Amino acid sequence: MQKNLVIVESPAKAKTIEKFLGKDFKVLSSYGHIRDLKKKEFSIDVKKDFKPDYEIPADKKALVSTLKAEAKSAETVWLASDEDREGEAIAWHLYEVLKLKPENTKRIVFHEITKSAILKAIERPRNIDLNLVNAQQARRILDRIVGFELSPVLWRKVKPVLSAGRVQSVAVRLIVEREREIHAFKTEAAYRVTAIFLVPDTDGKSVEMKAELTRRIKTKEEAKAFLEACQGATFTIEDITTRPVKKTPPAPFTTSTLQQEAARKLGYTVAQTMMLAQRLYESGFITYMRTDSVNLSDFATIGSKEAIIKMMGENYVHPRHFETKTKGAQEAHEAIRPTYMENQSIEGSAQEKKLYDLIWKRTIASQMADAELEKTTATISISGNKDVFTATGEVIKFDGFLHVYRESYDDDNEQEDESRLLPPLKKGQRLEYGPIIATERFTQRPPRYTEASLVRKLEELGIGRPSTYAPTISTIQQREYVEKGNKDGEERLFNVLTLRENHIKDENHTEITGAEKAKLFPTDTGIVVNDFLTEYFPNILDYNFTASVEKEFDEIAEGEAQWTSIMKTFYDKFHPSVENTLAIKTEHKVGERILGEDPVSGKPVSVKIGRFGPVAQIGTADDEEKPRFAQMKKGQSMETITLEEALELFKLPRTLGEYEGKTVSVGVGRFGPYVLHNKVYVSLPKAADPMTITLEEAEQLILEKRQKEMERHLKKFEEEPELEILNGRYGPYITYKGSNYKIPKDIVPQDLTLKSCLELIKVQNEKEPGTTKKKKTAPKKK
């Protein structure tokens, strides 16, 4: 009989923990949840206090049988799933499904995978916290109710196969509203005036000092008048102020701040950051990665202090205690930090090393002294004028935490870097001026959200929790309500007036403005679904309501509220809204926009959501003749497309001519513009316009695709037509019966025989679950 069985969530964690505990302990993994609500059924008995109907998925049944047998033969079962609500629910499901007994079942938690933390957890077991379980169950059931009841409404009113979620829908609303703010934004111009003054330095050498007018000038005429007033004027140092400035280090990382900073500094997506953090945690390098706490343990602060003294000296040490400001913080008891502060670097992939370095620096910085700076501001008066210029300089007296870490920010602005030193100045000093430049600048529209800034906004609104940010952002993109992309900048004209040697020069320049990278854009489907839900289910889309639901989950977790009564209150209001909305009949399809009339047929022209996305339509379903449809082009929006642009779409597909005796045509499909020749689709490059592409250009694209296909297909076998050796993005591989298999680097693909291919497939199929190289092939796109 096995003395002790420990069950954790992941196999990687199991191997590490088994080494710490020794031969009396066997550690197995549950691979996450072992049961859940039934996928294709509602699975909630509303009339019986919202009783959930759980099932063990088919792919977990063998695992559950193994865990049952091992638990039955163990003297003590230790449930060691993660310490958040999700982890507590996993422990409870294991207890229920494995039919464990209270007398020999112990619940243990730890927020780092180190020997001392594991042994301490074994010494301090506790019972399963049913309040945390109920909070998780309430979230799961409420989200199932919303998704299961709203989705059919969307299928009937908007488009089949759409789905809705409580937190996801609010995230989409934020992105839609920001997009509309951007489109509604009216740019205002004003002139920013800067001057270069020539000032002697300590050696008497003339150096340039830049200063800026303290106000913006609204019009070109006013700017010109100001420069004219500066001709022959005297510029004098009216005042000099010097003040000390302290900069305090930011708190250690929570889940959301790590996601934001990793995006800014490393360019990682939210999902990528969480995947890497999970690996670091399971390898024992960092503490638990789903947390909204900024606290550090005494062990961490002492370790930080020792590391700082060793590397930088005692004057850099300033132990601090940070308080968690997030209301309802509950996911863990400590911030994300390295398990051992003396480990400045780790072994791992390049991405893991970068993320660890970021976490280490942020943690160390939080326990370091303030940065001490000195800021000097000189005010420069203009004779005969009330306006003044100011010149600002900043010098670091003691770098403190800046020695290791500088926080990044999302918003770019036009502020000058003040970390320059001003030359020696004295009050009353007259200044010789060089050029004075009035540059036309423009107010900036609100920026689109990045994944990181969306996480920050959700956290500010109290929506979601550390465990939900990454799944929310992934889900809204997978459902094609939002897409992440880049936007090319637009050329803009701006005016510059320069006063130099008593002469004013008037010039126009151009600049590229509005370029954006990796931003979140709402799709037409996302906009239509958002507008529909906002109109008919305002509560679900209300920020305060969604945040209040999170607070109610917190109250359940703290034992201050009954989860069933909260479910009842919600359902009694929500369910009638669903039934009422289904009963409403609308004249037009939800989201349909009438653009005008087709001048040829006299029929109405509209845009709406079709089966494969937004389409333009001529005519209606009531006409004798079937309506004509045209797929909208990428970059076009249902909200902004004009009648003329919609009519242009009906010129596609168009025939370009013949090539090799077959017709060549160009059109726009579900995946964008294409050339079609002999039943083969070729995607158009980004710069190519389907309305202007020539037959010669299309022929070149056809030949390029053929060449790529020839390079892709390395080898076939007549006796086994389903097996082929292909050259893919990550190198050569075997494809066979819908699955892909890696070819080892030391093997030349062309030298493989059918027999050796089948042997490679057999070896890879026999590998343990979770380590197999076999992958299902994705369906091909046109």
Describe the function of each predicted region:
Residues 1-141, 149-150, 214, 409-413, ...:
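Intrinsically disordered, low-complexity regulatory segments
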Residues 2-5, 16, 25, 151, ...:
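Basic, low-complexity terminal or inter-domain segments flanking catalytic cores
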Residues 113-197, 242-246:
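C-terminal or mid-to-C-terminal helical accessory/interaction module adjacent to the motor/catalytic core
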Residues 217-253, 426-432, 439, 544, ...:
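Metal- or metallocofactor-binding catalytic centers and their adjacent structured scaffolds
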Residues 237-241, 248-262, 287-291, 445-457, ...:
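Short acidic, hydrophobic short linear motifs in intrinsically disordered regions
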Residues 259-261, 265-272:
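A conserved hydrophobic secondary-structure block that centers on an alpha-helix together
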